[in-house]
């Protein structure tokens, strides 16, 4: 047994010993009272609200007012006379007043452990150091914690364990709690932003008979009653556009997508997307709307349009750079010439040398995108709208009027990561049918991410869809930016993990 394994074994033995002691204490609680886990305590205040409401009250003013409160929380520290509690908003001390609390209660308090949850009544007071606390007149145990909290000096530092046991991570790490509060704020602000502009929030199917709306490999399942294969959705796009056909001219959805692909710091098989569509608009309108949304989000969450991330600062207050795929390759790779990009064989050689997975049947447009992904994408630090994607890789986007080889599409990159994807929607049913057929050929040639042919969607387009612009924004990656989080797992409450051995 290695030293590391020995240390781990000793730690496990110590934890088992502590758990056994706590179970003995719980057994004593069960014996002493009829209900070991009571549910009749009602608090009337959160700690953060108390701190804010009485911030300007002096020690003398609080003594004179004798403000009664009922609070509840988890024991995070026990300093003898003072116990530090934590609720969902903040931490606050409660004072173990030996002059007013019954002897029986004082004896019970001595048996409580870190992690136990208690309910306390008392009056607000302020210490000589200026700290607000509750001078307890009564207190009782509400929940006995059977497992010890992580060591107070080291906390829960193992990253993988933080992801596996997020409930413990949330207990002991304020930074984690802050991240998920921000996530909630971001989603609430997006809803408000779009609703104020006339967008209708909708819900579309998570189980689909044909996976569509993105180039990705789906999860497949089986519907027993209908005896048919079904797929977890990879995107809601085709259903949202059906709604535009039906007359809902501004719609959005914030929900989960599922893609049966790799796991990394940027990818999780289950992730949250915002998708929105507006009729009588194009992709340039969406660029303007996206800039406005991102500035408002940064200001609302950070109080500034400058967004710190790692050792960089992204400037959301400045106009986002707008550059085509083609021009971005030339700008960031001066060794590549227009002649290289316009020749299939030369482009294929560049893509292969750059590390792209070249199969050999790709057209020029797809090769250019491969080169972009390998040689440009990671260099796009400040916000960039990359536009005019080749039509081969944009089966749902409208062709550009001036150059039909490209589409009216953009992807937004910040910090070298794709954050959003948008385009003027293809509303020509015949063109869409042809592109679906091209995707079917790609799939037959071995591309697992190529799209299926969706006959019902073609049927919908044949009724007529107005000129429309649509966009998808990755909520998880956006929250990563706004919380300075290096991994997508830091912003997903329960990320997917391999089973423990």
UniProtKB/Swiss-Prot annotation:
Subcellular location: Cytoplasm
Protein name per Swiss-Prot or TrEMBL: Lysine--tRNA ligase
Catalytic activity: tRNA(Lys) + L-lysine + ATP = L-lysyl-tRNA(Lys) + AMP + diphosphate
EC code(s) of this entry: 6.1.1.6
A molecular-function term among this protein's GO annotations: tRNA binding
Gene designation per UniProt: lysS
CDD domains (alphabetical): LysRS_core, LysRS_N
Keywords of the record: Aminoacyl-tRNA synthetase, ATP-binding, Cytoplasm, Ligase, Magnesium, Metal-binding, Nucleotide-binding, Protein biosynthesis
Enzyme's top EC category: ligase
UniProt-listed Pfam families: tRNA-synt_2, tRNA_anti-codon
Subunit structure: Homodimer.
Principal location class: cytoplasm
One Gene Ontology term, aspect cellular component: cytosol
Residues that bind Mg(2+) 2: 418
């Amino acid at each position: 047994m290695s030293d590391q394994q020995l240390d781990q074994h000793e730690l496990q033995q110590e934890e088992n010993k502590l758990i056994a002691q706590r179970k003995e204490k719980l057994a004593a609680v069960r014996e002493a009272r009829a209900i070991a886990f009571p549910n009749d305590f009602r608090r009337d205040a959160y700690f953060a609200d108390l701190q804010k409401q009485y911030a300007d009250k002096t020690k003398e003013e609080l003594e004179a007012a004798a403000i009664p409160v009922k609070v509840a929380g988890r024991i995070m520290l026990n300093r003898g006379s003072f116990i530090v509690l934590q609720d969902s908003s903040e931490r606050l001390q409660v004072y173990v007043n030996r002059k007013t609390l019954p002897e029986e209660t004082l004896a019970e308090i001595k048996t409580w452990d870190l992690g136990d949850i208690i309910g306390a009544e008392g009056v607000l007071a302020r210490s000589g150091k200026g700290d607000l606390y509750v001078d307890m007149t009564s207190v009782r145990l509400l929940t006995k914690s059977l497992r010890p909290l992580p060591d107070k000096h080291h906390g829960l530092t193992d990253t993988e364990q933080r992801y596996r046991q997020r409930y413990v991570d949330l207990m002991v790490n304020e930074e984690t709690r802050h991240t998920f509060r921000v996530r909630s704020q971001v989603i609430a602000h997006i809803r408000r932003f779009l609703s104020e502009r006339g967008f209708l929030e909708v819900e579309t199917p998570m189980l689909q008979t044909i996976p569509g709306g993105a180039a990705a490999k789906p999860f497949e399942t089986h519907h027993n009653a209908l005896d048919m294969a079904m797929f977890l959705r990879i995107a809601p796009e085709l259903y949202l556009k059906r709604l535009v056909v039906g007359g809902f001219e501004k719609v959005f959805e914030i929900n989960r997508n599922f893609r049966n692909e790799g796991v990394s710091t940027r990818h999780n098989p289950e992730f949250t997307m915002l998708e929105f569509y507006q009729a009588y608009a194009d992709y340039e309108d969406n660029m303007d709307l996206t800039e406005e949304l991102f500035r408002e989000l940064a200001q609302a969450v950070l109080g500034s349009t400058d967004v710190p991330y790692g050792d960089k600062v992204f400037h959301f207050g400045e106009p986002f750079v707008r550059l085509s795929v083609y021009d971005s390759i030339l700008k960031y790779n001066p060794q590549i010439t227009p002649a290289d990009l316009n020749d299939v064989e030369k482009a294929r050689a560049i893509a292969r040398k750059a590390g792209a997975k070249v199969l050999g049947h790709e057209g020029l447009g797809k090769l250019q995108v491969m080169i972009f992904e390998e040689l440009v994408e990671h260099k796009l630090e400040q916000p960039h709208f990359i536009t005019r994607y080749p039509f081969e890789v944009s089966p749902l986007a409208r062709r550009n009027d001036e150059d039909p080889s490209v589409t009216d599409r953009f992807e937004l990159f910040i910090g070298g990561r794709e954050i959003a994807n948008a385009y003027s929607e293809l509303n020509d049913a015949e063109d869409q049918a042809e592109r679906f057929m091209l995707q079917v050929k790609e799939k037959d040639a071995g591309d697992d991410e190529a799209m299926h042919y969706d006959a019902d969607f073609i049927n919908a387009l044949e009724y007529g869809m107005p000129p429309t612009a649509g966009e998808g924004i990755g909520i998880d990656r956006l929250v990563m930016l706004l919380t300075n989080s290096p991994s997508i797992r830091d912003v997903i409450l329960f990320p997917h993990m391999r089973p423990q051995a």
